[in-house]
Amino acid sequence: MEARIIGLKGCGKTTLVSALAEGRGEGHIATVHVGDPRVRVLSEIFQPKKTTFAEFKVQEVAWPEASARKGEMERYLDALAGGQLYLHVLRAFASAQLGEPAHPEADLDELDREFLLSDLIRIERAFERAKKAPLPDAGKKALARCQEALEAETPLREVDFDDAQLSFVRGYQFLTLTPQLLVANTESEGSDQGDRWEVAALAKPARGRHAVAFPFPDALEVARLSVEEQEEFAAALGLPGPAAEVVAQAAFAQLGLISFLTTGSDEVRAWPVRAGETARDAAGAIHSDIQRGFIRAEVVSYDDFMSHGGNMKACRDAGVLRIEGKDYLVADGDIINFRFNV
């Protein structure tokens, strides 16, 4: 998965990249490791040669300078194409440098409108091109439906497309079609800037988007600590947790992702998949050969595994280690061993 970090100037995008990178970032790009405590526990039990957490990449896309904005805005919007998720950063802290109080709700509305306008322009261009290279009727109807929604100020991610329409529309890389997670950069706890802004203020303008809030500078300080120290210091600073963990969990929720787990002496690993995927689909996340030659899946939930002493034999004897077929719907935290033949 790849995410783009977006937001107006001065909101803290670069600081967020650093906090998410935990020292592993390269400029405005970072790889976020999803700190799943279940993976850590299983790694302690199995003592594998390798432990692999789920991860995703983030890239900051800088907001155009006001002096060059007219010429740069289109390039900025084009740079957002290809992201599977936008981390939309909002400034919710006072800034003497910017010389104005924070207005996160208004900032959210400003960028939302830019995205709506950009998508409308793309649709108009698509219809212009269609005069020379006609679109299929289904394509015309899909674009007309998009145009109708956008003119009503409805982002395309809120439109209930069928599978065929969605496949067609995705080809245009409309910005309002991409899911968003709102990430608010707030005042530190104990700040003398008056009442702290609360993320609940976004409930209405978020329009179904998940939102998290924490002070990015504090999160960056926590990210520089060892994994063992991060939880303790995050709590001491009033943070909901380390930034990478908080953002990753919210991003998974926004995208409808879950993780299943594989274990063994070679590797303990978390595998992200869409909620509702079958065992056979999940096997394909590991390797297409496993999906193609799928026979069965041996499944035990993480909770059942731990309640039976972290012992597979005990799980088998108790009947909580199950044999599932290809149509089994994978649940978050399932520990799965795939049997296959190719």
Name the predicted role of every residue range.
Residues 27, 65-68, 72, 108, ...:
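Residue-level detector of alpha-helix boundaries and kinks
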Residues 33-35, 61-70, 81-135, 139, ...:
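Conserved Switch II/interswitch segment of TRAFAC-class P-loop GTPases
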Residues 1-17, 21-22, 129-332, 336-342:
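C-terminal-of-GTPase-core extension/linker across diverse P-loop GTPases
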Residues 1-96, 112, 123:
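Conserved G1/Walker A P-loop phosphate-binding module
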